[in-house]
From Swiss-Prot:
The lineage of its organism: Bacteria, Pseudomonadati, Pseudomonadota, Betaproteobacteria, Neisseriales. It comes from Neisseria meningitidis serogroup C / serotype 2a (strain ATCC 700532 / DSM 15464 / FAM18). The gene is queF. Substrate binds at residues 77-79, 96-97. Catalyzes the NADPH-dependent reduction of 7-cyano-7-deazaguanine (preQ0) to 7-aminomethyl-7-deazaguanine (preQ1). It holds the Pfam family QueF. This is NADPH-dependent 7-cyano-7-deazaguanine reductase. Its EC number is 1.7.1.13.
Amino acid sequence: MSRNTEELQGISLLGNQKTRYPTGYAPEILEAFDNKHPDNDYFVKFVCPEFTSLCPMTGQPDFATIYIRYIPHIKMVESKSLKLYLFSFRNHGDFHEDCVNIIMKDLIALMDPKYIEVFGEFTPRGGIAIHPFANYGKAGTEFETLARKRLFEHDSQ
């Protein structure tokens, strides 16, 4: 079940050898494609070990591994656009908790997933590691209940 040219319209970054890397926060770079299996509930997981942002107070770099897991509905995020989007945080000054919530909200706006969670495993600074977790389940569905359950159990994994 290969994808045809029409299904790939709007995917402009994958395979593009002249990729330009954004110098500032760039949610508009995110691209989506149709989920061919919207009737199946399944997780898609991204592990992004090279995330960098800036401390809004000191301007010093913060490093993290960002974990994104979602259950797609109609749309899915294209991975190269996600890579470039995450790269766009490199010169963006925000707290760890803000970065995780911004990433989640931007992906919700792009895909409208059934469920999504974003976890940031930030490298310790000043002897303290910060690991923010944000999630969302589509209102009025079983995924709203899943989100609540996962929120309270996320740290037991």
